[in-house]
């Protein structure tokens, strides 16, 4: 996750023949502890110098909402600029130019959890394996996006002074219902 401090991350090994939708459904959601088909998501290529709201950007995601409570994916270009292409048949190996190239993944378009996916190397096998990671992922339906999550971490970590965020609210005001605080 690019927008949290400290950074929450996962390192996974996947086969290159997965589609982007499969990458979301069977790799990224489980690796982060999220439910599949609950919030909308979108992928896009990351090139140096591009902005996330650039009108020339192409987003890849489901062409329809997966559940009634998700933001309709056809609205992505209106909120974030660019165009939307359905991800159902796009394979992971077609999205990366080579080792070191990156792909953006946004989960929950309302909270805009931004992830950067970097290709380290190609994997021939069709296996999926969680190799490493750090940090508890954000709970589903958490309020306040990255800022509030970073505040929570700063209040819960023993060395909170190393994080720049402070909250005027108690953790219980907005997170207690998720973590039983």
Mark where each language-model region is.
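Short linear regulatory motifs enriched in tryptophan with gly/pro/ser
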Residues: 1-181
């Amino acid at each position: 996750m690019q927008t949290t401090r400290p950074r929450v991350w996962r390192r996974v090994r996947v086969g290159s023949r997965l589609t982007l939708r499969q990458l979301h459904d069977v790799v990224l959601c489980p690796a982060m502890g999220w439910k599949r088909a609950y919030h909308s998501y979108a992928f896009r290529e990351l090139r140096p110098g591009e902005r996330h709201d650039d009108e020339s950007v192409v987003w890849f995601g489901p062409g329809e909402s997966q559940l009634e409570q998700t933001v309709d994916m056809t609205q992505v270009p209106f909120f974030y600029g660019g165009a939307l292409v359905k991800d159902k048949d796009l394979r992971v190996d077609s999205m990366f130019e080579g080792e070191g190239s990156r792909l953006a993944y946004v989960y929950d378009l309302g909270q805009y959890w931004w992830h950067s996916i970097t290709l380290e190397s190609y994997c021939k096998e069709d296996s999926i394996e969680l190799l490493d990671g750090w940090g508890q992922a954000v709970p589903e339906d958490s309020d306040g996006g990255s800022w509030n999550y970073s505040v929570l971490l700063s209040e819960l970590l023993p060395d909170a002074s190393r994080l720049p965020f402070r909250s005027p609210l108690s953790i219980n005001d907005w997170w207690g219902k998720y973590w039983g605080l």
